Amino acid sequence: MPDYSYRPTIGPTYVYHNKYYKNLGSVIKKPKRKKHLVEHEEEEKDPLDNYMVAEDPFLGPGKNQKLTLFKEIRNVKPDTMKLIVNWSGKEFLRETWTRFVEDSFPIVNDQEVMDVFLV
């Protein structure tokens, strides 16, 4: 059985860890992949992604459902937009969303700022 104990007489000891080594192919292909992603990012943008739909959560699929489209104005984080909504207890999704807002918009008591995650 090999002896891995430290002995200063045998000179410096090195420990190699796999996490510091990368596949040569991935190192070479990474810039190419990045360039490809940047070039095709514009093509993959769907105009439908610029709109949000307010759906009534109490109506299941297949029932008559009134859809309201909202134009996206500003993104807060990658998957999030801030909305001002009328607030009335648990039924806030039934209310009409008043408008998209900027940070400078004054928030009134009966309105609540929400982050809506688009999943």
Swiss-Prot record:
Keywords on record: Viral occlusion body
Key word Amino-acid biosynthesis present: no
Record-level Gene Ontology MF annotations: structural molecule activity
GO cellular component, one term: viral occlusion body
Keyword Transcription tagged: no
Family matches, as Pfam families: Polyhedrin
InterPro entries with a match to the protein in the record: Polyhedrin
Family, as annotated: Belongs to the polyhedrin family.
Function: Major component of the virus occlusion bodies, which are large proteinaceous structures (polyhedra), that protect the virus from the outside environment for extended periods until they are ingested by insect larvae.
Protein name in UniProt: Polyhedrin
Species assigned in the record: Antheraea pernyi nuclear polyhedrosis virus (ApNPV)
Highest classification ranks of the organism: Viruses, Viruses incertae sedis, Naldaviricetes, Lefavirales, Baculoviridae
Gene: PH
